[in-house]
Regions:
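Alpha-helical transmembrane segments of multi-pass membrane proteins
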Residues: 17-34
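A glycine-rich, hydrophobic loop/mini-helix early in the fold
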Residues: 32-98
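Terminal transmembrane helical module of multi-pass membrane proteins
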Residues: 127-194
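N-terminal membrane topogenic signal
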Residues: 1-17
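Membrane-proximal helix-loop-helix units in multi-pass membrane proteins
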Residues: 76-143
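Non-cytosolic membrane-interface motifs at loop->transmembrane helix junctions
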Residues: 38-45, 98-110, 157-166
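Hydrophobic cores of alpha-helical transmembrane segments in multi-pass inner/ER membrane proteins
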Residues: 51-63, 113-124, 169-185
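Membrane-interface helix-boundary motifs at transmembrane edges
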Residues: 3-8, 63-76, 124-131, 187-191
Length: 194
């Protein structure tokens, strides 16, 4: 399998690490104005996508040295998939509502689509067990409460009137994410052991 050879190549891993590191930094900078008005207790839960890429960056750093970090791997897989898909859908929804999308919207579609894909591509290398996925699942679902009960969700001014529908969609996206993460990791391990 040629793609696995590429995914394991140290040079490729280093480039991917640097892309994710700079993407994480850019992502936190993108959230700067929202973080400035966020109560301290919620700060860790507001910058969803940069936090997801941060988890993946940490995974890549350890993976470069042939180490596994299952809790980080579970958080990376679930958050990359969920927030990657979420941002793509929200930007397409913005395009539908407004009839137009600026260059940043298209950049977010491409970069967040890539986030979701990279999390899935590395699934065969994760050492995730049920306890690791349970922690990541709690993180995802707890984040829904923070976002949609306490109003800390990312600010998309043009979509504000659809917050209830977006919250409902996001909850089910989390459930789908947990299912996909299980099937790609624990489910595959069960197949190999059978």
């Amino acid at each position: 399998m040629m793609y696995k050879y590429i995914l394991l190549d140290k040079r490729f891993l280093l480039v991917l690490f640097l892309i994710n590191l700079f993407g994480t930094i850019y992502g936190f900078m993108w959230y700067e104005s929202q973080l400035a008005i966020t109560p301290t207790i919620f700060l860790i839960f507001v910058p969803d996508s940069p936090t997801a890429s941060m988890f993946f960056t940490i995974f890549l750093l350890f993976f470069l040295f042939n180490k596994n970090t299952p809790y980080i791997e579970a958080l990376a897989l679930t958050t990359l998939f969920k927030y990657g898909i979420w941002a793509v859908v929200m930007n397409i929804f913005t395009l539908v509502v407004q009839g137009t999308l600026d260059w940043q919207g298209y950049m977010l579609i491409a970069s967040h689509g890539a986030m979701a894909i990279q999390g899935i591509l590395y699934a065969p290398f994760y050492k995730i067990k049920l306890r690791h996925l349970a922690v990541a699942s709690i993180w995802l679902l707890h984040n829904e409460i923070i976002d949609y009960v306490y109003g800390m969700m990312p600010i998309y001014h043009q979509l504000t009137k659809y917050m209830n529908e977006i919250g409902y969609f996001t909850f089910w996206l989390s459930i789908l994410t947990i299912f996909v993460a299980y099937k790609l990791t624990i489910g595959q391990q069960d197949k190999r052991e059978a």
